[in-house]
From Swiss-Prot:
Catalyzes the reversible interconversion of serine and glycine with tetrahydrofolate (THF) serving as the one-carbon carrier. This reaction serves as the major source of one-carbon groups required for the biosynthesis of purines, thymidylate, methionine, and other important biomolecules. Also exhibits THF-independent aldolase activity toward beta-hydroxyamino acids, producing glycine and aldehydes, via a retro-aldol mechanism. InterPro entries: PyrdxlP-dep_Trfase (IPR015424), PyrdxlP-dep_Trfase_major (IPR015421), PyrdxlP-dep_Trfase_small (IPR015422), Ser_HO-MeTrfase (IPR001085), Ser_HO-MeTrfase-like (IPR049943), Ser_HO-MeTrfase_PLP_BS (IPR019798), SHMT-like_dom (IPR039429). Signal peptide: none annotated. It comes from the Bacteria. This is Serine hydroxymethyltransferase. Keywords: Amino-acid biosynthesis, Cytoplasm, One-carbon metabolism, Pyridoxal phosphate, Transferase. It comes from Albidiferax ferrireducens (strain ATCC BAA-621 / DSM 15236 / T118). It holds the Pfam family SHMT. Its cofactor is pyridoxal 5'-phosphate.
Length: 414
């Protein structure tokens, strides 16, 4: 029998120390990685429940194990809530991550050697959309689309390539693209060439849930997403689909790709979806957009260039070449000043992928901890202060002190 009073710090002090150190880092650093956020205590509590003990292969009401009547309730709540959020016909909440969700779509509709079309990783796409080293690039013939000279999606070139290559599947979505995506335009092209239209909305899902970024669900055959990032849930994936595709997608997830679903994570997804249905979630997402605009405008005023000239979402790419610093160097020096970002290639980047000429900045996490316009402006100026003198240790120390004072005023978990 387990004793609930015996906790991690007693049974595994090494792991407890690592957890405590990571908690301190999250509280002390300004989190600016666009794909990261802070899950609520309720979401984290759901992940720590006894639901982790339950095997539940199959779907609610159709399990291969007994004793699933209560985990069925949790999964059905997650399904119903995510359908309500996005207006979807059907939903699968079992994918372990966004990549698994994307792979399930490929398994449902494609055969090895089929042609797919996705956004080039070098111009803002995601590695699961056809990158050469990813299974999507190894198993399928990939035709990529990219940006025009204004650094906006080149819809005309995309349409032309689609008619030339006749892909079986067209993917819209990105991991480093700051503007709105015209899902209706993609849908028309897909229909014209007879392709399945898939949207990976992982980065934009929270904004879409709040109704402040275009919703792809009315236009796409299938929509995949992560449940963390801007949606602010646990780490995991979902697939939304037209009713006629539900059987194929469900079979692709189980038994096609996965066995037992993670019922504790699915319960946490349900909690996050309920949070996303509340009025305050829209207020939060509106502030995410405002903070991103303020950060972008402030960085421009300090001599930095924003790829595409602006942001219309939570994310932006920053061209660092005017500061004579690489993305790799900027990531390290900003980290030492307690601001966490990630290096990121910019379009036509002359540097290697592990070096880069840019960084990606996002505002979901800073907004969760309570930052508004003024704090966003302060943060952007602190970023610029570091980039103006990245090798001056006194400058880094001064910025770090200001960051620590700011994060102390706005604790994540109190």
């Amino acid at each position: 029998m387990y004793n609930r009073n015996i906790l991690i710090e007693q049974t595994d002090p090494e792991i407890f120390a690592a957890i405590a150190a990571e908690n301190a880092r999250q509280e002390q650093h300004i989190e600016l990685i666009a794909s990261e956020n802070y899950a609520s205590p309720a979401v984290m509590a759901a992940q720590g429940t006894q639901l982790t003990n339950k095997y539940a292969e199959g779907y609610p009401g159709k399990r291969y194990y007994g004793g699933c009547e209560f985990v069925d309730i949790a999964e059905q709540l997650a399904i119903d809530r995510v359908k309500q959020i996005f207006g979807a016909d059907a939903a699968n909440v079992q994918p372990h991550c966004g990549a698994s969700a994307n792979e399930a779509v490929f398994l449902a509709f494609l055969k090895p050697g089929d042609t797919i079309m996705g956004m080039s990783l070098a111009e803002g796409g995601h590695l699961t959309h056809g990158m050469a080293l990813n299974m999507s690039g190894k198993w399928f013939n990939v035709v990529s689309y990219g940006l025009n000279d204004k650094e906006e999606i080149d819809y005309d070139a995309m349409e032309r390539k689609a008619h030339e290559s006749k892909p079986k599947l067209i993917i819209a979505g990105a991991s480093a693209y700051s503007l709105r995506i015209d899902f209706a335009r993609f849908a028309k092209v897909a229909k014209d060439v007879g392709a399945i239209f898939m949207v990976d909305m992982a980065h934009y899902a929270g904004l879409i849930a709040a109704g402040i970024y275009p919703n792809p669900v009315p236009h796409a055959d299938v929509v995949t997403s992560t449940t963390h990032k801007s949606l602010r849930g646990p780490r995991g994936g979902i697939i939304l689909m037209k009713a006629q595709h539900e059987k194929a997608i469900n079979s692709a997830i189980f038994p096609g790709l996965q066995g037992g679903p993670l019922m504790h994570v699915i319960a946490a997804k349900a909690v996050a979806f309920k949070e996303a249905l509340q009025p305050e979630f829209k207020v939060y997402q509106q502030q995410v957009l405002t903070n991103a605009r303020v950060v972008a405008e402030t960085l421009v005023s300090r001599g930095l260039r924003i790829v595409s000239g602006r942001t219309e979402s939570h994310v932006m790419l920053v061209d660092l070449r005017s500061k004579s610093i690489t993305g790799k160097e900027a990531e390290a020096v900003l980290g030492s000043a307690h601001m966490t970002i990630n290096k990121n290639a910019i379009p036509n980047d002359p540097e290697k992928p592990m070096v880069t000429s840019g960084v990606r900045i996002g505002t979901p996490a800073m907004t969760t901890r309570g930052f508004k316009d003024e704090e966003a402006r302060i943060t952007a100026n602190l970023i610029a202060d570091v980039l103006d003198n990245p090798r001056d240790s006194a400058n880094i120390d001064a910025v770090r002190a200001k960051v620590n004072a700011l994060t102390k005023r706005f604790p994540v978990y109190g």
